[in-house]
Amino acid sequence: MSDLTKLTLAGARDALKKKEITSTELTGAYLKEMEAAAALNAYVTVTADKAMEMAKASDAKLAKGEGGALEGLPLGIKDLYCTKDVLTTACSHILDGFKPAYESTVTSNLWRDGAVMLGKLNNDEFAMGSSNETSHYGSVVNPWRRKGSDAKLVPGGSSGGSSAAVAANLCLAATATDTGGSIRQPAAFTGTVGLKPTYGRCSRWGIVAFASSLDQAGPIGRDVRDTAIMLGSMAGHDEKDTTSVDRAVPDYEAVLGQSIKGLSVGIPKEYRVDGMPGEIDELWSRGIEWLKAAGATVKEVSLPHTKYALPTYYIVAPAECSSNLARYDGVRYGLRVDGRDITDMYEKTRAAGFGAEVRRRVLMGTYVLSAGYYDAYYLKAQKVRSLIAQDFASAFSEVDVLLTPTAPSAAFAIGEKSDDPLSMYLNDVFTVPVNLAGLPGISVPAGLSGEGLPLGLQLIGRTFDEETLLKAAYAIEQAADFKAAPEAWWKA
């Protein structure tokens, strides 16, 4: 079989079961592609020896007709996930040299089902960013380029390594995390599918925390089927995570292709924001027509507090981040910068170890939690968060899913927004409300911009109703028939 890395995860799974290929061959092909794609900077750690060992073990199982749901399938793992005895840094200088003594629950689930680890993927430092430019290991480069231009573009963030690796065929699928859009926006920027499950659907245990009430693990894949398969392995109750919900994990793949006739789709009127490019609006209109043609009914709904979602998020998330990041002090692991006394050591270690964006968010969070400002900012933000959740609950009393754009633009150039944090934060305008309400959301590639870059549509579902979400996403995917792929300029 030629060019093994072009197979989808589902296609590779079936080929392995039929013994048309081996996991060793497949894994070797990916390791070769990864080596040729160093210019994309998608991986920060390559675990080649471990990958081949895991592949050989999978081949032995497959030869006997055994194996799990992901047996022998090579995946990339976001560097936010703790992987036992494998460097895990959250792409921060402050975690230099940290090799966890334990495995995250989600990656444990993947290895239980037979998956193979290719390596750790680049991300924004501590997942704080929308462009993968804040990583200590440098920016990830989007495999896509504008027509007639060789300018390097961002792959989105914070899961930019995950989205770039999937788009460039450097893994079959990847784990990612989403705190304010960090799965869906990178997927939209790279022509991949990104699924943020309901808060509590996947365990957060062993994933480096950014904002604990918002963080959620999820997959990025080449198509809707691949993300459904991945979620089936990643999801599940975990007693080690008190926010993990004890609910049965459905067969997500089984719902794909089911009719959406009679499905009610809501269009939030507040998402028609000023200054949104016409091509994004046109794509949204096409998405509406695709769903209608598949038998769905469409109606306008209102989410009146959506306009407050970004400021609410940028109070709640930094507040939680300032608390979570207090644990990085140079005492037990990671970077340590010597000082005159322990307080001086703390200060010097944190100043040297955290990048500019992380320091900015820690300061913002500390400020909104401080005496005299807690009530004015943090408490008010939590109240608005409740109103945003109520808006969604009201909308879902009328409709089954919501359809919106994923991002207000296509991918932008590296460095284009670095000096303008507010402009960068606005990139999350369509994704942040979903996290504040704890809902599932998925981004599906649906077309190309005038400059030849991928654009995504976002579907939002009811809590723990990923099945309906995936069913609708599959209908969009079939109608959009998105077959475009980036030219492999990095191999030239």
Swiss-Prot record:
GO terms for cellular component: glutamyl-tRNA(Gln) amidotransferase complex. Keywords: ATP-binding, Ligase, Nucleotide-binding, Protein biosynthesis. This is Glutamyl-tRNA(Gln) amidotransferase subunit A. Its EC number is 6.3.5.7. The keyword ATP-binding applies. The gene is gatA. It comes from the Bacteria. SUPFAM superfamilies: Amidase signature (AS) enzymes. Heterotrimer of A, B and C subunits. Signal peptide: none annotated. The keyword Zinc does not apply. InterPro entries: Amidase (IPR000120), Amidase_CS (IPR020556), Amidase_dom (IPR023631), AS_sf (IPR036928), GatA (IPR004412). Belongs to the amidase family. GatA subfamily. Allows the formation of correctly charged Gln-tRNA(Gln) through the transamidation of misacylated Glu-tRNA(Gln) in organisms which lack glutaminyl-tRNA synthetase. The reaction takes place in the presence of glutamine and ATP through an activated gamma-phospho-Glu-tRNA(Gln). The active site is at residues 78, 158, 182. It is an enzyme of class 6 (ligase). It catalyses: L-glutamyl-tRNA(Gln) + L-glutamine + ATP + H2O = L-glutaminyl-tRNA(Gln) + L-glutamate + ADP + phosphate + H(+). GO terms for molecular function: ATP binding; glutaminyl-tRNA synthase (glutamine-hydrolyzing) activity.
